[in-house]
Amino acid sequence: MRLDISTHKTILFQILKDTYSDTTISPFLGFKGGTAALMFYGLDRFSIDLDFDLLDETREDHVFERMISVLKRYGTLKESNKKRFSLFYVLSYEDRAHNIKVEINRRQFGSRYEIKTYLGVSMLVMVPEDMFAHKLMAMHERIGKTSRDVYDVWFFLQNRFPINQEIVEQRSKRTFDKLLQKCISQLEKLSNRHILDGVGELLTTSQKDWAKAKLREETISLLKLRLESEK
């Protein structure tokens, strides 16, 4: 599939604008994930999907239907499902263009959100320390399937973002330092041949060259430093 970053970014923003302009659903959706990190916390890679938390389970049916209405304005809805843990949609806005996945998580982890504004649109956005915690857990759970989370964890570590250790411990059922040790072990076993899987097309050429050569070892090094600081 072809990825036209300019077009894709425009449609992502239009969907967000429509979503957060709808007062019947906007108070119940917490924006998170890679696109939120790109827009509000300086993440230096492109992001292609939209991720939210559902903040009031009693509004699930209404939110599910309203998001269908929003997404249909921008193309063909190829999928709209209520999965075990999420509301899930796949939007095709052009033939041969990259699809947009929208996922609304229904699980509660005590995450916090604050109002932030992007190009005049106010959105409820997950605070950075909670976002970092969920990114670390995503890397731990999906390592070997996609390296997108590895890049994001490197970004949060490199830029010295705080992390909500309680969320990490709640999700992993491990102490924070034990989870860090596990992540280090997982990365040490990860082949560099797969380090661009799921993230390569979202990086510039120079970023790809750097990631291929350095991402895995730099992330391991920063995790070890973080682990050392916990002692």
Sequence positions of predicted segments:
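Structured mid-to-C-terminal alpha-helical surface segments
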Residues: M1-L29, L43, L55-E57, D61-K231
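Glycine-rich beta-strand-to-loop/alpha-helix junction loops that act as flexible
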Residues: F31-A36
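Acidic Asp/Glu-based divalent-cation binding sites
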Residues: D51
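Glycine-rich loop at the start of a catalytic domain that most often binds anionic cofactors/ligands
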Residues: Y41-S47
